[in-house]
């Protein structure tokens, strides 16, 4: 719409200039010619003002929402915040080590993975030894990954490995997140939460709250004083 008005304004300016030319050629013929000259000049000035205003409006509309007509972003107007989406990657099981640790073949290389945001009772700790519900957690994870036809890993937005070189990820067995399944069964706590590696934190906390409500395994009454 602005482009059409701009074109009309330019046409008006041309007509006004022609009228002024006619008025100048007849200015000596009398009072009416002088009035005609004044009218034509006024039309030209008004037209130039309108054209200038429309031109500014057209330029502004080209950067509406921070995007030029060409489709490129104008960084002075709009700055988009990039959001990295999580995606799953295929892997192959080598073995389950304990409740929250598995060894996988990932991108052609063997790699040990530590499940993000969860902590299961120990079974192989040099000082803690075997903790209550540790064997159950290990058996649960082992069953999930060994019975799965498809294993996938999903890294979060932050660092991908810990200080021991283990991958930090959500592990999926046939589409089911092992991390969440452990928490839901009361075999793991939500732990080691560090931003930005906490995309699924609320999902896990919701599952943990339900496990507590149902007093499952580490949240059971007979385990209340065990320090779990």
UniProtKB/Swiss-Prot annotation:
Q: Where does Ca(2+) bind?
A: 100, 119-120
Q: What is the first-listed, main subcellular location in coarse terms?
A: secreted
Instruction: Give a GO cellular-component term.
Output: extracellular region
Q: Where is the signal peptide?
A: 1-23
Q: Catalytic activity, per the record?
A: Endonucleolytic cleavage to nucleoside 3'-phosphates and 3'-phosphooligonucleotide end-products
- In the UniProt record, does the keyword Calcium occur? yes
Q: Which UniProt keywords apply?
A: Calcium, Endonuclease, Hydrolase, Metal-binding, Nuclease, Secreted, Signal, Zymogen
One GO MF term attached to the UniProt entry: nucleic acid binding
Per its Swiss-Prot or TrEMBL entry, what cofactor is needed?
Ca(2+)
State the name under which the record lists this protein.
Thermonuclease
**Protein's organism:** Staphylococcus aureus (strain N315)
The encoding gene: nuc
